[in-house]
Amino acid sequence: GAVGGTIELSDKISLVALMVAILSFAISIISIYVQKKLNTINLDAKYYELIFNQFILDKIPNKVALIKFDSKGKLDSSYKSLNSVMMEMVRKARYFSFVNPKFYKGLSDRTKKLDELLVEISSKTYINIIEQNKEIIRIEDAVSKIITYINKHHSQI
């Protein structure tokens, strides 16, 4: 013990040992938290890839490539298959409505905008080839915004 206000060496050692134990405990807690966060991030990244890769790399580009106008100046019915692929992607991404509702709503809203655009364009007739190309570019742009949105969120994980 303390004699005459001085702390003995054994007490100093005990105090240092206690501080080291507390510090070591705090570091353990922090590393568990960081590891859990990393596991969640890795899991989310895995889900993004699992859900979106097939659409972004294959299905969507193939459907967009088929978009064209028929000889009467109407949007070819191939736009319907693009629309169903987009809706299928949103359905398969429903997992994110639970873990990242803001992202899911953004994806859903952008896909609905594309749907509305496709319906709008398909309801009109475009005789002029330049006008037809402008509309195809609008469709490609809307699809591009959806893919960019997905990629942006994937890279933020």
Segment roles from a protein language model:
Residues 1-39:
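Membrane-embedded hydrophobic alpha-helical segments
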Residues 8, 71-74, 125-128:
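Alpha-helix capping and helix-coil boundary motifs
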Residues 33-82:
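Amphipathic, membrane-active segments
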Residues 77-157:
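An amphipathic alpha-helical interaction surface
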Residues 12-15, 20-22, 72, 104, ...:
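Generic N-terminal initiation segments characterized by hydrophobic and/or small/turn-forming residues
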